[in-house]
Amino acid sequence: MRILEIFAILLILKEVRPQTKRSHKVNMKTPFQKRKNHHLNTDSRATLMSPADLHSVEHSIVQIRDPTLIPHYDQKSQEDMKLHFLKNTLVTCNDGTTAGYYLRETKGSKRWIIFLEGGWCCYSKETCGVRYDNVKRLMSSSNWPQTRKGTGILSPRQDENPYWWNVNAVFVPYCSSDVWSGNVSKTQDGYAFMGSVIIQEVIRDLVPRGMKQAKSVILAGSSAGGTGVLINIDRVAALVEETTSESVQVRGLVDSGWFLDSRHSKQSDCLDISKCALTEAIKKGLKLWNGILPENCKQQFKKGDEWRCFYGPRLFTSMKSPIFVVQWLYDQEQLRIENIQTEFQSMTENQWNSIQNIGREFKKSLREVPAVFAPACLSHTLITKSNWLEFQVKSVTLAKALHCWDRSLQENRAPKGVIRGCPFHLVDNCQWPHCNPTCPAIYDATSGQELSILQMFLKLRLESQRRGQEPKGDLGPLMSMLRNSG
């Protein structure tokens, strides 16, 4: 019977696999795998993993799949975003160099997108030292390129970015290592943590460049930048309204920054973030950074528990500004925080079941959020990917959902005012990782070949049988879900 079952699966693969074909493949190998053949001190393209014994600290540092991180050496054009340093030179990166932003202005436009870069954080002398040695650009502006290309929602190309290609686009590089919350000019170890102040100064510098006449401002961010949006959006809204001459709508776009409380906890002193709870790193960091958190959120917790305001589900209930949450249901960073690896050759039964539980927890946490785009995929960050239009939930792209949300806010002035035929609360219904046929491709770590969801499951199942284990669930529901595409 077992042989017949496997044979049946292989027959079905011929039917299902074409659904996963795509013109642009997103490599899902871990950053560590990609980095094996590269020198560690490459600032222009930092990875999430660090060398040898400190690999897990560095793993937490930065996303590598953001094309805007690559210096652009072609002939300068009007499509490039150009570097501007802050006028207030006292507002600095970790190492004391002046912070700044990249700007592409569009004449006549009164719409603005301000994007906060991600890249995790450092929270002690040791972790900040590792970060500075390996990804200096996340702590210093000294080697920033003069221009960047905008991609995804920052792209000036209408075919790549149909609704926001002609807005004023701002990219704020992350060089404060404090999840955009810090407010200290120099610690005893010599580092500045001024993320929250940098955002405020960027807004002030943009006022004479046209923001004074703004009608719409979106504060967006990915990963740590997305968490930075959650933490800062209400203060940004107040500052924008104070400095603009007309009525302006300010809203937030949170990409892969909606983290859940980790179920893992370690009481011992933690220098390596993979060996301790995320909450321990945040607690340490909050003190080091003199972090500024929203007062409305802090009031919900007793003294000493303010760190809970770094988590989206905790923070959302006290927010005033409308936000749109973009969140992979099987976010790779959340899985890493939970000590779950996604290499199917070595995954255990418990890890497989834990991955499914994470998806259910994300769904539950997003129920009361009016504007959501949550595909059932294994990935991390989305809005600045050049192929962001490929991904869909219930046959709706993220760009379309954002446009519907934008229209709803303009026409109804209320976050729950849904326009008929224009949905913007989109959460996949299917129950398995990567059950959405538009998910980014997954590749076999050994062969490099792309895997369909059924091949992935079969690989896991065969490996589990070899170990005398069996992932819970049968293939019938999985096949049905694949045919219905969530």
Curated annotation (Swiss-Prot):
Glycans are attached at N183. It holds the Pfam family PAE. GO terms for cellular component: extracellular region. It is found in: Secreted. The active site is at S223 (charge relay system), D331 (charge relay system), H380 (charge relay system). The keyword Phosphoprotein does not apply. One of its GO terms (molecular function) is palmitoleyl hydrolase activity. InterPro entries: PAE/NOTUM. The keyword Zinc does not apply. Disulfide bonds: none annotated. This is Palmitoleoyl-protein carboxylesterase notum2.
